[in-house]
Amino acid sequence: TTKLAHIITDKLIHIHPAQYVDYGIDFYDETLDICDTLYKNLKNITDKFPECRYFKNLGVNAHVSITPPLPFKFYIHQEGLEKIWSSVTYISPKENVGTKMYTAQNEDAFVKEAEWVPNSTFIFCGKQGKTWHSYESNQLTNRITFNLFIMKYRSKKCFYPL
């Protein structure tokens, strides 16, 4: 993650598995294994969330995300309607802002923050009008996460199935 932390950017960067080698990320096989396990356990996973959306054809989007340092903020938004399950694993730096949750699309509706703890994961199932959230960096370095989304299958968006 040292190389990723030092990339100079003012825009959000998503590094998909096919691009890992370009960024010196040695995690392709592990990403494939994780996606395979998620895919084989879709029913068990979605059964844990009673109001989970579902589509006939599902796939997994996987990427490493680089969020620029201060003053970048990703606006308050709800999860895309094509996503049924979302997972964000906090990687680097040691301290940062986690995922902020809201009851509406405004700062006054702030409820709680999923605390940033490296190597911990925040998981949720998006529900229209309910799962408002945002993220940002409060540091002078990039915020690095590993993201997985079970979603309606779209060949240009889904890494798995291959």
Placement of each model-derived feature along the sequence:
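Non-heme Fe(II)/2-oxoglutarate
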Residues: 1-51
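Active-site rim elements
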Residues: 17-36, 72-76, 108-111, 132-136
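A structural signal for well-ordered alpha-helical segments within the folded catalytic domains
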Residues: 32, 36, 40, 85, ...
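A broad, low-specificity signal for short, low-complexity segments enriched in glycine/proline
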Residues: 44-53, 105-113
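Non-heme Fe(II) oxygenase catalytic core, chiefly the N-lobe of the double-stranded beta-helix
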Residues: 47-85, 98
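A structural signal for short, well-ordered beta-strand segments
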Residues: 62-64, 87-89, 146-150
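Short, low-complexity Ser/Thr-rich regulatory SLiMs
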Residues: 66, 89-91, 139
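Catalytic core of Fe(II)/2-oxoglutarate
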Residues: 72, 81-83, 93-162
